[in-house]
Amino acid sequence: MDCGRDYCVKDLSLADEGWKKIDWVSRFMPVLQHIRREFEEKKPFKGVRIAATLHLEMKTAFLLLTLKAGGAEVSAAASNPLSTQDDVVAALAKAGVKVYAIRGESKEQYYEFMHKALDIRPNIIIDDGADMISLVHKERQELLDEIWGGSEETTTGVIRLRAMERDGVLRFSVIAVNDSYMKYLFDNRYGTGQSTWDGVMRATNLLIAGKNVVVVGYGWCGRGIAMRARGLGATVIVVEVDPIKALEARMDGFLVMNMKEAAKIGDIFITATGDIKCIRREHFELMKDGAIMANAGHFDVEIWKPDLEELAVEISNPRPNVTEYKLKDGRRLYLLADGRLVNLVAADGHPAEIMDMSFALQAKAAEYIKDNHGKLEPRVYILPREIDEMVARIKLASMGIEIEELTEEQKKYLESWEHGT
């Protein structure tokens, strides 16, 4: 472990490999490149301190470097103990980001490093799962007066923050970047859809075609996972608690059933709910020999490991990122990535082109907080639509796509109530 005054990483000598990764993905992130050039010129964050808790891999590194290019003092810690890429954080440390993260860090180190990232006394927090914002409210309340606001990347985090707002304990404004069109329509659906299966296939090296895939949760992440499973040739079964989403899944052409029925026939199970104990003892007891489980939600609580451990007579690791639970009756159940985010633990996370849009929103959310914090109340906000549209237009331009514009006549027609049948 290499630790200095402003960093704690596995090995600083890995930085060159980290730079190669960052350079590679930056070539496929034209929107964030555009914003970085803008930030380098205008320095909107001069004198501003930004602390981030994110999955510290190559795309998030480019976001942090973009904020630093805008004049910010930047610190960072991991939002998941297993998603850190050690070479990338070494590169960040060499670049002057105050970074504290080691792949495989303990729970104690996880929070110790988060505290270190908060020691810069941030004005803005960028969160992924709301752990840092929660920690500030619980244990670092002396920082609250200096915090202008924060932003949140994930569905899970937004749920937690809305609960804080509802309970009257949220002390500063937070931008729910996750709830922006350019986030959930693309990152949650196409990003999670592709990267989840990337993680499953890297971890197992097994065929998806012909298998029964059970997708637990049919939000935007679940939609993407189900869509890509069908594209890979699987029979897809959706498990839902929301009758509207369940009906939508059926109309989209997927089978829909409850978890107990799905447990009997599933070959691969993917959770994407943001909730606890979605697959538990009563379901493990029904699964066929060789069933594989993976989680695409933020926390490792959706597939309930304590029940698996109680049922198992033997636990082993036949492959990296695969845990085998042998049950009393001889059945073997497999859990990928220790029940954590399979796309980030067993693979490299979402494609760069997707995170280009999400992190462009994060960069602009930070700028929005800096410019408007005096007018914002301690509640959860959504980014203004014009920022969504700006990101979409830059992305389209980078793809060589020119869209139609409304004529003045069309605008007037849409604004009028007088024209009828």
UniProtKB/Swiss-Prot annotation:
Compartments, record wording: Cytoplasm
Manner of cofactor binding, per the entry note: Binds 1 NAD(+) per subunit.
Native source species: Pyrococcus horikoshii (strain ATCC 700860 / DSM 12428 / JCM 9974 / NBRC 100139 / OT-3)
Secretion signal span: none
Single GO molecular function: adenosylhomocysteinase activity
One Pfam match: AdoHcyase_NAD
Gene Ontology CC annotation, any one: cytosol
Cofactor: NAD(+)
Family named by the database record: Belongs to the adenosylhomocysteinase family.
Identification of the protein by name: Adenosylhomocysteinase
Keyword Cytoplasm: yes
